[in-house]
Structures are given as structure tokens and as C-alpha cells.
Amino acid sequence: MKPLLFSVALGLALQTLTSAQAPKNAAHPIPTIVDRDHHFALMVDGAPYLMLGFQANNSSAWPAYFEKVFPAAAILHANTVEAPVYWEQVEATAGHYDFSIVDGMLAQARAHHVRMVLLWFGTWKNGSSHYTPQWIKQDQEKYPFLVNQQGKTVDSPSTYSPARLDADKKGFAALMRHLRTADPQRTVVMVQVENEAGVWGGIRDYRPEAERDFAGTVPQKLVEALGLHPGTWQQVFGDSADETFQAWCIATYIEQVAAAGKAEYPLPLYINAALRDPIHPGKPGSYESGAPTDQNIRLYQVAAPSLSLIAPDIYIPEHAKYMAVIDQYKRFNNPLLIPETGNAPVYAHYVFAAIGQGAIGFAPFGLDLTAYSNLTEGAEAMGDKTAHGPETRLAPFANDYALLEPIARQLAAANLAGNVRGASEDPDTHTQTLDFPRWQADLSYGLPAFGNWIKPKGNSPPDGGAVIVALGSDEFLVGGHHVRVDFTPKFDAAKKRLFLEVAEGSYDATGKWKTVRIWNGDQTDYGLNLRAEGTTLLRVKLTTY
């Protein structure tokens, strides 16, 4: 879609919805993910939807703790809650399913006017099988663990368990069947299949059945998809044969679970990945083997076509590495979703870069109100008794979401049209540029509100960022925090930027822009200075002189 047409399309897309509005009890189309020229959108109630979410802590999805999960959405200005569904609870007795907790979460989500993404903690949770029911854990002959290269049993499920696969398929299918009837409002917009599947403590399974298959030939569809010559796993993949074989075993297992659920209710399904270092990946064994890490993305796509996307869980705070992960998972055939990221303050500003790279959703982990903190990655203030309430503890994320949530639908529609750019402050580079057809947007960090004779020094901490939407060839929607935004014409070095109008305002529920004041004078003479907090949105019209 051309930028000039975007404003018209935006109004049509948003006539009936605000970004966090929960649907009424009427028929709504099933959420889906659409692709337009390799730009993606999650469609909810027939319109593009940007997921500004958070994930509950692993043990928070119990009724006694609902009051510490769903109220966090309002504090954060989030429109989506991610929460686990525990196989061990759903099927405590084999063949008998209890979805009362799921129903309770749906009711809570509707009451708090948010959508949900459910996480099926089935065969895998972080490489282990700790959420399988007790009747599975107690029968290890029928439901075996993986055996590693030293012949030792490790705390990771073997894919060579037809009984466990069958049980997982039935359990996940039962969940999706229940959602089909229990959620006509489409409160649930996506479902994650398993959680960070892979192997810790080994490279691949060495059980006799696995050894037999490893000695066999690589499946033809994988060879063809990767453009390789046929042969055994060792012949085709060499030093990476063990890890690639394990990835195929896991991916084909997950595909059968996903397909069983999708046959019941075709919501968008995805898997999440525990990452290896995107710049210095190391050897297999230093990261979760067989997982949907960057080198295995194409394999998982081939093996598991029932999945809508493969998503990275990003717990790497360094700017260069964070952006490298986004580059690895943002593909022409893989929508970008960040379903987990760290909850330390440094992670908050990455929402700007994620949206600018076309993400359909962003969700920090563990931002409920239980005061639990995964200290290696998390906000220590979660458990700090001196913190002044949940608003203080969640403030870095709430600050950015407060700006973005009112325009979440607009951003989603603009991203589908390819008209969004965004960036997050890099502590090593205090200026950044964003490219549009006729203009370059110039971002500077650490400048005062007045004057252009000072060199940008960066913010401390580096928490700035901006998102810019092209509304036309010379018109932009600008939002951000702790950043100065200016524009440079691209095709005539003799020309300089001139602001025709800088309007501060907001969109109403129908997508119509409402101006509250016009910026000029000190507010525009040195570019557009956006504070470290606040919800200022600017509609900017440009020309040259």
C-alpha cells in the first residue's frame, strides 16, 4: 500500500474498534495472520492488531493468583496477557480434561478488556517435561527420557515415545476444541505449542530407535527444501548432523501436536525458541540442542507447516545482539513476534525497534504482580519492599506502552502496509537514521530541548526510542521517548527541511485524528524533542526550502 493511501485505509480499518476493546458476544472472525508483500499483521475482529503484551510468571496461572496477573494489564497499558495452560492440571487423570482454569482466565481477560495468548506447557517446558501429568512422569518405560551421547538419561523427553505423542496430541486437541466452543468472543488470539522445546544435557537422542533413524537417509522433503544432496544424516550435514537430526525429531513431533489442535480450531499457532548467541553461537551443547534456533528455522518450517511462525525469546540485553536476533527471525516467510523478552528496564525500549521491524507482538516476561523476579534477567525491584507499588516496578514498560497502546491498531495497519520505521537507542551510537522514500528521519539521543550546537551524548541509561509512520510522501506520525527527531530531504543536498505543520494530538475510536495544539517556535526550531515519558504524538507535514 502506498503511504499516500494509508490514512484512508486506516480509518476504514478502525471504525469499530479501539486497541484494547474486548469484543461483544457476537460472531467474530477467527484471528489469523495475513501477509501482504512480506509484511504481516495479526488480524483480530477483522482488523490488524498489534499485541502489546506481557507474560505471567510460570506458576501464576492459578485462580488464587488471577488478581495478581490481570490487573497488571491496566498498569502496563497492555492489551494482551500471555499465560500458560498446564498439561499436568488439565489432564491430571488420563483421558479426563479439566478446563475450569482456562475458563477462569477467559473470564478475567474479558473483565479486564484484554486479549490472551495461551501457552501450552505440554511435552516441553524449557527443554524438560516438568509439566507432563504425574501418570506420565511415573511410567518412564512408556514415556522415556532422552539418552545422550554418554549413554546417560537426561532431563529431557525422548521424541521416541508414541504414547506421549499420542497423549499430547489428544490433550492439545482437547484444549483447542474447548476454546472453539468456550470462546466465541475470540478472546484468545494465538496459542503457543509447547515451550522452548529442545535438549539440555545432550546433543541428540541415542536411544536404539534414534540410532536406527540417524543411520538412515534424510527425508527427501528436507533435502529438497535446503537444496542439498541426498544421503544419511552424517553425509548430508557433517559436523551438524547430530543437532540437525534432533531438531527434525522435535519439529516433526510438534507438527503432529499442532496439526491435531489446528484441526479442532485454526487459531494462529507458533513455537518459541531459547536462543543461542546470535553473533558468537558456540558449539552444540552450549545452547539448547535441536531447538528452533536461527540455523534451524527453515528446518522447522519444513517439518511443521501447521505453525504460523517461529518466535525468539530474547534475553540478551546488548543492542547489537538484540537487533541481530530480530534480523535472524524477521524473514519474508516468518512474521516477527517477540513472545518473551527480559523484564529488566533495559529491555523496555526495544519495543520501538521491534515495531519498526514489523513485529506483530511484543511481551516482556514475568510482569505480573506476584513480586517474583527471575533475578538473572529480571527487574530486582519486583521483590524490593522499598519500591513504591506496582506502578514503580513496571514503570519502564508502562511508560512505553502508554504511548503505543492508543495507536496499536494504527501501527498494526501501517506495518501491514510497510509504512512503519522504528529504532531503539544504541549505547554505542548516539544517532540513528530511518529511511523513507523521500525523507530520512534523524534520531539523536542525549540532547537538550534547545539548540543544535551540542553533540549527542546519549541517554543514561540508554532508554530512548522512536516509531515513525509514513502517512503520505511528506507526512508522518511521530512518537517516541527520550529522543530528538528531525528530517532530512534525500534527493537534493541544497534543500533543507521546513515544517509545514507539527500537530500534537491523538486518534479517536474511529481512527480520526484530533489536534490539541500546534507546535512551533522553540518546540520545532531544533527538531522535535520527545520527553523521557508521556504520550505525545505528533502529526508532521514537511516541505523544503
PLM features: what roles do these ranges have?
Residues 142-299:
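Polysaccharide-binding and catalytic clefts of secreted carbohydrate-active enzymes
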Residues 441, 445-466, 474-545:
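C-terminal beta-sandwich/jelly-roll accessory domains of carbohydrate-active enzymes
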